[in-house]
Amino acid sequence: MPLRLPDKLPAIELLKKDNIFVMNETRAHTQMVRPLRIVVLNLMPLKITTETDLVRLLSNTPLQIEINFMRLKSHTPRNTPVEHMQMFYKSFKELSLQKWDGMIVTGAPIELMPFEDVEYWQEIQTIFNWARTHVTSTLYICWAAQAGLYHFYGIPKHELPQKMFGVFRQYPLIPDLPIFRGFDDTFMMPHSRHTEVWRSDIEKVHELKIIAESPDSGVSMVMAREGREFFITGHLEYAPDTLDKEYKRDNGKRNDVVKPFNYYRDDDPSKGPFVSWRSYANLFFCNWINYYVYQETPYNIEEIE
């Protein structure tokens, strides 16, 4: 799939090494097609890494996709150069004037804070409400999934006694859904979080469907509004070495750090990770783009409501 990205975005050179077809804006303007328009609200600290992870997964269909990145007014990132944010990110005020075929809201390392104590909570609520009338389908990932479930449906999050950290086997509960097209009877998903949502809370809300879960990591996927909203509690988008970097960053600094479960070869960090989720991640994002964005969005994007 030709990915339409801003000129000079750092992810471009990395993706070209993976033989992913990347099209800059100059070339894209010469093609007489309407690209799917995806906006990404990237709340992760290492923004360039997350950009690359997501863009790589959006590269698996023959559709042209235009990707834009959104920044918050109420929060200034500390781990990303100001120049990068100014060059590649646009404000919600600017992007909110347009409509979008799809949206992705990432996680953020703030899950132990009450939602109302997050400095950008009010702005996030405004963006969530806006997405319901301006986006065909939205993916909420990890913290964003918990935040969206709380904001829209009053689902609380609960602190875990120990960090959910590793790669866990998931079970599709409605396997004939288009989002699971091509999936096996089980699939793997990385998790890295200190909080969770409970099945018992979600089951009280008839608008919500739990579509995948694990006996070890709990609810992993929730769908609402016939696929216009997906809440994903894990990280299918993670690169092979992400959990390894988290473990090495925290090991020795805190007493509660444990090795990521079911991740290293022979459970030995020196042998590197055993990647068991990559194919499912590609399938999931491909199915989302095809069945819940491309096939549902109007050709006239202004008709989204």
Residue ranges and their predicted role:
Residues T50-D53, N79-V82, F115-E116:
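Short, glycine/acidic-enriched capping/hinge loops at junctions between secondary-structure elements
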Residues K73-Q86:
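N-terminal beta-loop-helix "entrance" segment that forms/cooperates
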Residues W100, V105-I174:
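Cysteine-nucleophile active-site neighborhood
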Residues M85, Y89-K93, A108, F115:
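Helical hinge/lid and interdomain linker segments adjacent to catalytic or ligand-binding clefts
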Residues M1-S74, Y89, K93-L95, K99, ...:
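Amide-donor transfer/coupling interface in amidating biosynthetic enzymes
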